[in-house]
From Swiss-Prot:
Similarity annotation: Belongs to the class-I aminoacyl-tRNA synthetase family. MetG type 1 subfamily.
EC number: 6.1.1.10
Gene designation: metG
Lineage of the species this protein comes from: Bacteria, Bacillati, Actinomycetota, Actinomycetes, Mycobacteriales
Name of the protein: Methionine--tRNA ligase
Function per UniProt: Is required not only for elongation of protein synthesis but also for the initiation of all mRNA translation through initiator tRNA(fMet) aminoacylation.
Length: 611
């Protein structure tokens, strides 16, 4: 029986183009997962968008001498184009500066406030002395007062896992310009997390299938849980929908309060854009539906504490009780899938320091599947990993081109040359049957890995089967059989077995490498869409949903979204038995080998930096 699977993907900031470190964390893993879920017959809703509020955009707008809205519009479009180029199969990729998003965010806030989970408190806020602008928690660094780590942030210390306030830090400094912030009294709405702690703990203790590091970190957060500010002294963001606050342009909702609501607001937008305004409830209100959230490790707290806390409070599930809001009881995350960090030649990605590889540049030179493959086999799934051009060239040449691409090309070429079609096999030998059985069993092995978000393990098994097929061909020597007319039936059998395994491995790799999977499908005589791709759709900003928002963006502006029709694709997670007599297409090389010199120099737009 099929399930409804919500795939919620972290929202990239629209303050610049995205680099490969970003998509290694939130992009490719979530897409591999969603594509696999569709192939096994589940009803997937994959949503995200650009995060367009908060200080990062204000800072970048100042640097570029433009308005923050113009900046958001520009980078929203660039990011949309890049993610489509990478083949990320969103059902809807939208943005946070829409009328719909504002209205849904404010509905959540009002529900929390009415249930008593929003506290008005005076706190100490950090301000930049040179600009007078509020500094958000994450833009302040200093020494942790609890463990002594010198790189603690104003919201938490990654070294010891404790929550912090900026004023807690020893020797605090601004990440923007290094100056010491001033701390002033300011009034804010605080999410009463202590009143939600028991409900959060009960939920977390039932998450036994999470990655151990994510679960341990999330449970540790509860040990020092405290109210957390959900408004900010800032003039760019979602208005606070409370009388006396909603018209105050100097105070807006915290960017992380509204960003996590984006998964819900995007689902609601998708529903009415596809003609069924209530369809989102199938993924959010049905307790049988499941939800998976993909992000980098620095965002775990917002997805295992803040967002679940917001949903619990909105439903009246904390210690203060309360009434359920009109959006209903919202499903808590089934799993929070966190990736570690990808670095570049040992350094953190940094646009300002030139340590960066932008997605757009990468796609233009190497194509999407090369990047998707590298992230799958060498990405930061469980530990921080390093991107080097040397490792990239080695992986592409020895694995993707030599092992997989060569298998496809030589098998299809021999079959096309000698038969022009899928040949009719004779009786299988023990060696033939062993390889066929092994390839068929791999559907279970790879599928189990993908269900648990173990992407490296899944690709490793698929490549192992490809290697076995290459060994089989080397042992059977079909090029010799082709020279002996009496071995015609054996040649047909060997090539049939090899082609069937190529088809199997191609299916196993479809979630990872959808672009090349389509080519292999067509080479084997397939017609139609094997692996569907997303597309860009221009839409108007409208908000037909019922919650009444305040201070909404102007109606009618246009913006690009990513959508796609993935229901008609032919890819399914099972062996497709090849039909003898099916015409083969003349194969073309699947992957080009890279110049070995690239490993030493890097491309012109991202050269290797010599010590």
């Amino acid at each position: 029986m099929s399930k409804r699977v919500l795939t919620s993907v972290a929202w990239p900031y629209a303050n610049g183009p995205r680099h490969i470190g970003h998509v290694a964390g939130f992009g490719v893993p979530s897409d591999v997962f969603a594509r696999y879920q569709r192939m096994i017959g589940n009803d997937v809703l994959m949503v995200s968008g650009t995060d367009e509020h908060g200080t990062p955009l204000l800072v970048q707008a100042d640097k570029e001498n433009t308005t923050v809205r113009e900046l958001a519009d520009r980078y929203n479009r660039i990011i949309v184009e890049d993610l489509v180029g990478l083949g990320l199969s969103y059902d809807l990729f939208t943005r946070t500066t829409t009328r719909n998003h504002y209205a849904i965010v404010q509905e959540l806030f009002r529900g929390l406030n009415e249930n008593g989970y929003m506290l008005k408190q005076t706190t100490r806020g950090a301000v930049s002395p040179s600009t007078g602008r509020t500094l958000p928690d994450r833009y302040i660094e200093g020494t942790c007062p609890l463990c002594g780590a010198t790189d603690a942030r104003g919201d938490q210390c990654d070294n010891c896992g404790n929550q912090l306030d900026p004023a807690d830090l020893i020797d605090p400094r601004s990440k923007i310009n290094g100056e010491t912030p001033e701390f002033v009294d300011t009034e804010h709405f605080m999410l009463d997390l202590p009143a939600l702690a028991e409900a959060l703990e009960e939920w977390l203790k039932g998450r036994n299938d999470w990655r151990p590091n994510v679960l341990k970190f999330s449970l540790n957060l509860l040990k020092d849980i405290r109210p957390r500010a959900m408004s900010r002294d800032i003039d760019w963001g979602v208005p606070v929908p409370i009388e006396g606050w909603q018209d105050n342009n100097a105070k807006k909702l915290y960017v992380w309060f509204d960003a996590v609501v984006g998964y819900l607001s995007a689902s609601i937008e998708w529903a009415w854009r596809t003609g069924d305004p209530e369809a989102w409830r199938k993924w959010w209100n049905d307790p049988e539906a499941v939800s998976y959230y993909f992000m980098g490790k620095d965002n775990i707290t917002f997805h295992s504490q803040i967002w679940p806390g917001e949903m619990l409070g909105y439903a009246g599930k904390g210690s203060k009780g309360g009434e359920q809001g009109e959006l209903g009881e919202l499903n808590l995350p089934t799993e929070v899938v966190s990736s570690e960090f990808l670095t570049m030649s040992g350094s953190k990605f940094s646009s300002s320091k030139g340590v960066v590889i932008y997605v757009r540049d990468f796609l233009k030179e190497f194509g999407p599947d090369a990047l998707r493959y590298f992230i799958a086999v060498a990405g930061p799934e469980n530990t921080d990993t390093d991107f080097t051009w040397d490792e990239f060239v080695r992986r592409i040449n020895s694995e993707l081109a030599n092992e997989w691409g060569n298998l496809v090309n030589r098998t299809a070429s021999m079959a096309h040359k000698n038969f022009g079609e899928i040949p009719q096999p004779g009786e299988f030998t023990a060696e033939d049957q062993a390889l066929l059985d092994e390839a068929k069993q791999a559907y279970t092995v790879v599928g189990d890995a993908l269900q648990l978000s173990k992407f490296k393990a899944g690709m490793t098994e698929a490549m192992r089967i490809a290697a076995r097929a290459n060994q089989y061909i080397a042992a059977q020597e079909p090029w010799k059989l082709a020279k002996d007319e009496t071995q015609r039936e054996r040649l047909a059998t060997v090539l049939y077995v090899a082609l069937q395994v190529v088809s199997d491995v191609n299916t196993l790799m479809t979630p990872y490498l959808p672009f090349s999977a389509q080519k292999v499908f067509e080479t084997l005589g397939g017609e139609g869409i094997w692996a569907a791709q997303p597309e860009i759709v221009e839409v108007k900003d409208e908000s037909p949903y019922t919650p009444v928002g305040v201070g909404l963006p102007e109606e009618g502006s246009s913006y690009p979204v990513i959508m796609g029709n993935y229901t008609e694709q032919k890819a399914i997670w099972q062996r497709t038995e090849l039909a003898p007599g099916t015409a083969l297409s003349k194969p073309k090389p699947l992957f080009q080998k890279l110049d070995p010199e690239l490993a030493e120099t890097g491309p012109e737009w991202a050269p290797v930096v010599k010590d």
